[in-house]
Amino acid sequence: CEETGLCLGRKVEKPVKLDGAWKPFADAGLLPDPSSLFLIARAITPPGRVRRFDTRFFTADASSIAHRVEGVIHADAELVELVWVEIGSQPLADAHAMTKNVLAELDRRLATGPLRHDAAVPFFHFYGGKMQKDVLGA
């Protein structure tokens, strides 16, 4: 819920008390449930950058959204807009190259049938000054 206002969770019978980033879940009568998330790729930004990231990219079906928190996305937030677009569509033309790589991987996986938790995952990283793609779990 924190960055997008979209909560992936499951309803609970009895209210629970959760604090911090988990509070929106409790307020909505939910417990966090990552079972609908599918790991699509991992990427580490190249050395020498001021800010480096070791990122895991996940996807979930929109039907997994159990609650929406209003007011999370606005001009002063990390995300100023949340939109749904088709993979390969024009709004993604200016996306970062790694984002395009990950979306292409998602598109390939969707083309083979339903997503699976045991699928091999590409790992993009730099080695010897070059971008390398290893496959984890293959």
Task: Label each PLM-derived region with a short phrase.
Residues 18-138:
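Nudix hydrolase/Nudix homology domain
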Residues 1-21, 92:
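Conserved Nudix-box catalytic region and its N-terminal flanking loop in Nudix hydrolases
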